[in-house]
Design a protein with these regions (language model features):
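Extended beta-strand solenoid/passenger and fiber regions
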Residues: 1-46, 53, 82, 88
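Surface-exposed interaction regions enriched in Ser/Thr/Asp/Glu
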Residues: 55, 59-88
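Glycine-rich loops and low-complexity Gly/Arg-rich segments
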Residues: 46-49, 71-73
Length: 88
């Protein structure tokens, strides 16, 4: 059995200090993909806010949308990175 091929895609954006819902249009193309992939097309999804891995119960991902399930948005300027890992 040879090496397992994987793909690692990253969706980057920054918090405006107000929103809890982010869409494809919030993605910053210079840093990564601008498309939020649907969970059924990837093997794993990880969310990092300011570099800290977030527990899965704190967010929902669907095709084109990230919803933060918190009553407070991240501080303005906080980095939001959604990592998609695809194991082929």
């Amino acid at each position: 059995m040879g090496p397992i091929t994987t793909t690692n895609l990253l969706f980057y954006t920054f918090s405006d200090g107000e929103k809890l819902i982010y869409t494809d249009s919030d993605g910053i193309a210079q840093y990564g993909t601008t498309h939020i992939l649907p969970p059924d097309e990837v093997s794993y999804i990880n969310l990092f806010i300011n570099g800290i891995l977030q527990p899965q119960p704190l967010y929902q991902v669907s095709n084109g949308q990230l919803i933060l399930l918190d009553n407070q948005p991240p501080t303005q300027g906080s980095s939001i990175i959604l990592q998609f890992i695809i194991i082929n």
